[in-house]
Regions:
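Conserved phosphate-chemistry cores used by DNA topoisomerases
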Residues: 2-237
Length: 237
């Protein structure tokens, strides 16, 4: 999006990196013809940026970048956009996947400050390992009531405020746009430190299968798929 895209443009190495912000969810390509797809500003911009053209005139030798990195938020919306993009690449740019040119960025989920040290955690398990199981998130600290006056046995609110006296803070990143350019570079864009996952044909086939099941016209199959996987779903409500 524009927020993370703006930070990314400020953070990038201009000699080797280009950033293409995608606003919102891209077009549902399940039923879209090539001409309708190219009427979408986002897909048209992506095709131009890649340089390969699309459809019958696709030419991988004209590919302008050898690492195409999908960077989305670590939430349900981000996963949806990532699935849309993987499906687009699988159906219309498959040689890019076969050639090992498509990657998924792995931004951190948490920023942990311990005194003057800064650590980044990419999972809940890593957060617990660095900060400890009981370390409160900043959002939890901000929502706490002020310490009540008086003496005696601490109340639950007082007990929760003990964390304020410890030089430890844990911030959860809900999206790439929450990072400033320096953080985005350090964690997600610096070739020396970033973590990338190479997209394989199997990954793209899985994304395409799920996309086809959920966005296609076979309603009974979609209902059956949703019912069988309902317990595995992660929902933002």
């Amino acid at each position: 999006g524009d927020s993370a895209g703006g930070s990314g443009k400020m953070a990038r190495d201009r000699l080797t990196q280009a950033v293409l912000p995608l606003r919102g969810k891209i077009l549902n390509i399940e039923r879209a013809r090539i001409d309708k797809m190219l009427a979408s500003e986002q897909i048209k911009n992506l095709v131009v940026a890649l340089g390969t053209a699309i459809g019958d005139v696709f030419n991988i030798e004209k590919l302008r970048y050898h690492k195409i990195i999908i960077a989305t938020d670590a939430d349900v919306d981000g996963a949806h956009i990532r699935t849309l993009l993987l499906t687009l690449f699988y159906r219309h740019f498959k040689p890019l996947i076969e050639g090992g040119f498509i990657f998924i960025a792995q931004p951190p989920l948490f920023k942990i400050k311990k005194g003057k040290e800064i650590h980044y955690a990419y999972s809940d398990e890593e957060r617990v390992k660095i900060a400890g199981k009981d370390a409160p998130l900043e959002s939890e600290i901000e929502d706490e009531a002020p310490t009540p006056e008086g003496v005696g046995v601490p109340t639950s609110d007082e007990g929760r405020n003990v964390g304020k006296n410890v030089k430890l803070s844990v911030q959860r990143y809900k999206g790439l746009g929450e990072m400033n350019p320096e953080e985005l570079w350090e964690t997600t864009m610096d070739p020396a430190r970033r973590i990338l996952k190479l997209v394989t044909i199997e990954d793209a086939e899985d994304a395409d299968m799920v996309f086809d099941m959920l966005m296609g016209t076979d309603v009974p199959a979609r209902k059956s798929f949703i019912q069988s996987h309902a317990k595995e779903a992660t929902l933002d409500i």
